[in-house]
Amino acid sequence: MPSKIALSISVLTAALGMVSAAPHYEYKSYNAGHNVESVVENKLVDASDLTLGVDILKRTDYSACKKYVSSYNAGYNVYSINENKLIDLSDATVKLSLLTNNGRPVKTWNKAPRYCLEYIKSYNGGHNVIIDNENKLIDLSGLNLGIDILKRKAPEFSYYNPGHNVKSTTENKLVDASDLLANVNILSKRGDKYSYYNGGYNVESDTENKLIDLSGLLANIDILKKRTGSQYSYYNGGHNVESTNENKLVDASDLLANVDILKKRGDKYTYYNGGHNIESTNENKLIDLSDLTANVGVLDDVHVNIGLLDKRTDKYSYYDGGHNIELTNENKLIDLSDLLANVDVLKKRTDKFSYYNGGHNVESDTQNKLIDVSHLTAIVNALSKRTDKYSYYNGGHNVESTNENKLIDLSDLTALVNVLSKRSLKGYGSKIHARDISEELYRRTNADEDCTCVKKSKPTPPKQTVTKPSADCDAPPAVTPKPKPSTKPSPSPTTPPPSKDTSKPTTKPEPKPQPSDKPEPKPSDKPEPKPSDKPEPKPSDKPEPTPSPKPTPPKVTCGTDEVYVDEGHNVVSKNSNKLLDLSNISINIGILDGLFGGKKSKEVAADSTCTSKQGCCVSKSVYYYNGGNNVQSSNENSGIDLSGLNLGLDIL
């Protein structure tokens, strides 16, 4: 038996050796003298190297194939071969030609014989399209779609690797579009849509754990553009270009999107940090757009002699005043705290996009993002004319913005709207002064007299003396500097409450001896036998019934058009548990500013607080701020909170 088993194994080994010794050549690739390697692993459906050839001593007469190449048409013929389809549209022919200038209509051959494929390919001039589908439910594997409208003499796509190896490795992708290149051109002529040059150094992009990988996606859209070069050119500067993408669901970290409409010769966006560090930290974001920069302008560089639409100003200037700018945003569902939007349409004398790394390595590391658009740069311009739309300057100090646990965080949003403005906006700040508001924040009951209640820093309240508004103000805490003559000014009803305030420091030692009558009955009687007996019976009788109902008498009595605010509380209404938090937004309103003498703009910061010890009377037009209209609105648990919204409007 062992001899028979050994004999069978030797026979099988000899048979396998004969099969392996047979020469066979499965795949041959030639790429102008350079190697192109594509490695695709762990795909849901992997058909990258599928090659099927069946030939059993068949001889084919190719004389019948000559009719398919009788009209050569410079390599623009289309051949369609369809067999055994579930839905057969092989005889359907759709031809769409709009103002083609090549002088040759595209000819379509339907149901060409399959054995003519090699014969047709030898005459295709490099441009014929062959559609070959067999036994597919729906087969779009070789689909090539080209749409051109009014296009002339420009190659649609050219790829050249200038003598270097191009290696693309994609692993464990559900959908791999890392090398996807999409170009759409309408009326494009002789121009470079996109040029990429790494300055003689390596460009490395590492993106990991993405849902969808679009790291190499390049999308260019041009409408009515002139005098530009080839649509797409790729050159790696004489060095290797390596793109490694792993475990991405959607990776758009290197996505570059450029949209230009009638634009010429100019830089759209310049960014400079003033020689200091700019730090942006965003963590646990579902969508991170913290570095998104968008530019909007209308009618830019168009010279109009009408005195509307400002001229000769920068659209957007950002300077950190020589100090660090730190932005910390945590646990945001959507973080748009640093969003800058500028749109520009019909702009001239600008360059679309130039990327150069200054002779250094460019490294992009993005990890654990569901959708990573951190390097997305979108530039849109619409008819803009040299106006300062938005200027931000921190006055030489640190600017720190901390936003936590917001669904949508717009707490630091500042909105300025300029319509037909002739004069530049004045400084826009968040400081508040009591006399800068249309209706004073701190007001008495009578409309004839106003007084400001000042809280002094010294701990001796009896030094505050106010004689004029004594009949109106219940707030002044003291009239005389000494506690002894405090009982003298009894004719006015307002003087006893300050005496209560002066007696409060005396009452504080009083409750102490009462619970502790044993250790200190004598020392309290010795130093103050007389003054303790005189003020004690009156304040002892009064404050005992009054401390619970009378924290209110020292408060300021407010009018019908005013709202009482306690010390340390906000002057503008606060709202909590909001879906949208706009409580810290500033409002700036100016109408007909600069004309007919002008009108002062009001600046009220939403985080302004009352500093008076007796509280403040705030006008309802300020507390419930709604564009100058008095609206009483208290919002809690609201879906959208606009109570603290500060909106800047400037008309004429």
Swiss-Prot record:
Q: Where found?
A: Secreted; Secreted, Cell wall
Q: Name one GO cellular component term.
A: hyphal cell wall
Which residues are processed away as propeptide to yield the mature protein?
Answer: 22-23
Keyword Cell membrane (UniProt): no
Reported phenotype of the disruption mutant: Leads to completely wettable colonies and the reduction in aerial hyphae formation. Does not affect hyphae formation in an aqueous environment, nor pathogenicity and formation and viability of teliospores. Leads to the induction of genes encoding small secreted proteins such as UMAG_00792 that have similar characteristics of the rep1 repellent peptides.
Any single GO molecular-function term of the entry would be: structural constituent of cell wall
Keyword Transferase listed? The answer is no
Q: Where is the composition biased (Pro residues)?
A: 478-499, 545-554
Highest taxon of the source?
Eukaryota
What is the protein name stated in its UniProt record?
A: Repellent protein 1
